[in-house]
Amino acid sequence: MRYLLVAFGLLAGAAHAEGGADPDWPCIQRKQPHLSLGQMWTGPEPDDAARALARTPDIAALADRLEQRRLPIATAEAEIAEYAKSADNQHLTALMLAIFDRVEPHRVALMEGIARYGHKQVDLAARIEDHRHRMATLEAATPPDFDAIDAQEQKLDWDMRIFQDRQQALTYVCETPVILEQRVFALGRA
């Protein structure tokens, strides 16, 4: 039964990884390594003045607050609407640029971490397969060394548990870049 679970887990992981065009990308979602402001914002293209405004303390502080995921999107939209009452288009563009400039580097680092996570899963799957081969060799020996078989089985069980826990966490991990994209897009529409 354990071998069946191992085989299923390895096949599911391999099929899961084949979903995207990038072999290093373990997520179902298509890998979009970098976003552009134009994908998220339909307003005017930021010029040098907007870039300078984006670095001002008031806009930077507001962007720092709005980009935080713990702030409900409805609250963030209300704060943008309140800010828009007294701000011109240049300031709104600067605010969007400041938000984007905070989220995008975080998102890129997160995606690089996901790729490393995927590599660790592949390495762990190879280690599990190695445990299986060692167990088969130990079980085929005459006479079988039951202590060695038990030790190998414990290693296999432990690695399988880690592998399965990571596979379950992968769904959430893969959703995080999408959540960040959706937040930036929603704030750009506000």
Name every feature range the model reports, one short phrase each.
Residues 1-7:
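Sec-dependent signal peptide recognition
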Residues 147-190:
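Alpha-helical oligomerization segments
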Residues 83-112:
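Short, charge-rich amphipathic alpha-helices with coiled-coil/heptad character
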Residues 17-18, 190:
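Structured catalytic/translocation cores of nucleotide/phosphate-coupled proteins
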Residues 73, 114-117, 121-131, 163, ...:
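Long amphipathic alpha-helices with heptad-repeat character
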Residues 18-88:
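N-terminal Sec/ER secretory leader and immediately downstream segment
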Residues 93-104, 122-160, 164:
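Extended, amphipathic alpha-helical coiled-coil scaffold segments used for oligomerization/tethering
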Residues 8-17:
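Hydrophobic h-region of N-terminal signal peptides that target proteins for export
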